[in-house]
Structures are given as structure tokens and as C-alpha cells.
Amino acid sequence: MASCLPNASPFLVMLAMCLLISTSEAEKYVVGGSEKSWKFPLSKPDSLSHWANSHRFKIGDTLIFKYEKRTESVHEGNETDYEGCNTVGKYHIVFNGGNTKVMLTKPGFRHFISGNQSHCQMGLKLAVLVISSNKTKKNLLSPSPSPSPPPSSLLSPSPSPLPNNQGVTSSSGAGFIGVMMWLMLLL
């Protein structure tokens, strides 16, 4: 029996590493699902709200805002500034580089608006709900509260669901897991 322990230990370490990697995958989301989606005019005033509601954002995920830096910017602020499209909020973080990457580091709502107030008022704003990455699968499958859509969305029908992975890139550990499984077979 004692001779089994040395062989079991590497197996358990590799199994633990595989489980850790598969549960800690972070996603990168291009806001709006495509290049230059952070621009005005939008295809529909509530298109960014619908896009955000079709995804589950977790701690560690990254939002990528792609926009024309000469004409647009991204402001991160609070809910009040988001609702009122206040572009001069006291606690705003302003991004204006054209390719802004924002890592989601804690659970809760994050609010982003255009630096151009009239663009924001026409729907160029985004609220996302970030969930803790240690939620159970049951919690991930249950509906979550959604950010307040612009008033025009109350009158328009809901669009059909977006296809999976629209605007999403995964930093998957699938290749690493395959290598680890191959190594386990060699042992």
C-alpha cells in the first residue's frame, strides 16, 4: 500500500492543477461584440444594454472598448452619472486611447458612458453586472438583475439572442489540460 502513495501524489497534483485552471478562465469581451462598437450612432439606442444582458461578467474578465480616439472617449462613473449622462462627474475615470481595456476586479455594477453627453443620451453607455467567479453553476444559470435600459427599449421588442461567443475571446487552459492529461498517461 505504501508503494501506491508516491504514484498517487503526482496524479492528485495534476488533477488539482487541471481543476484550478479550468475554473479560473477569464474572458475578454469586446464591448458591443465587434470592432468600433463604442461609436455613435449606434445601430439601436439600446444595443449595448442588450449586449451586456446577454453575457455573464465575472471577476477577472476584461472589457475592451474600441473606438475612434479623436471623436470618442469612455468615462467610468457611478450609477447617478450613468443615468443622467453626467460627463463631468467628480469621481470619473476617463479613458481616451481608442483601445481601452478594463479588468473587472470586484462584484457589483460597473457604469460606463461616452465622454460626449449627447452620444450618451442617445444610448452610448454601458452598465455591466460583475459576479463573483466562485458562484455555483446554479447561481450562474439563474437570471440576474439587469441594468436599467433606456426608455426607448420599453417600447421596442426584444431582439433575438446573440450567438455564443460574440465579442468574446477566451484565455482557455484547454491546451494545457490536454498536455497534463498526456503526462498523466505516461506516469
Swiss-Prot record:
Residues 144-162 have a biased composition (Pro residues). Residues 138-167 are annotated as: Disordered. Keywords: Disulfide bond, Glycoprotein, Membrane, Nodulation, Signal. SUPFAM superfamilies: Cupredoxins. This is Early nodulin-55-2. Disulfide bonds join 85-120. Gene3D superfamilies: Cupredoxins - blue copper proteins. One of its GO terms (cellular component) is plasma membrane. Induction: During nodulation in legume roots after Rhizobium infection, and after release of bacteria from the infection thread. Belongs to the early nodulin-like (ENODL) family. Transmembrane segments: none annotated. It comes from Glycine max (Soybean). GO terms for molecular function: electron transfer activity. PANTHER family: BLUE COPPER PROTEIN (PTHR33021), EARLY NODULIN-LIKE PROTEIN 10 (PTHR33021:SF519). GO terms for biological process: nodulation. It is found in: Symbiosome, Peribacteroid membrane. May act as a carbohydrate transporter. CDD domains: Phytocyanin (cd04216). Glycans are attached at residues 78, 116, 134. InterPro entries: Cupredoxin (IPR008972), Phytocyanin-like (IPR039391), Phytocyanin_dom (IPR003245). PROSITE patterns: PHYTOCYANIN.
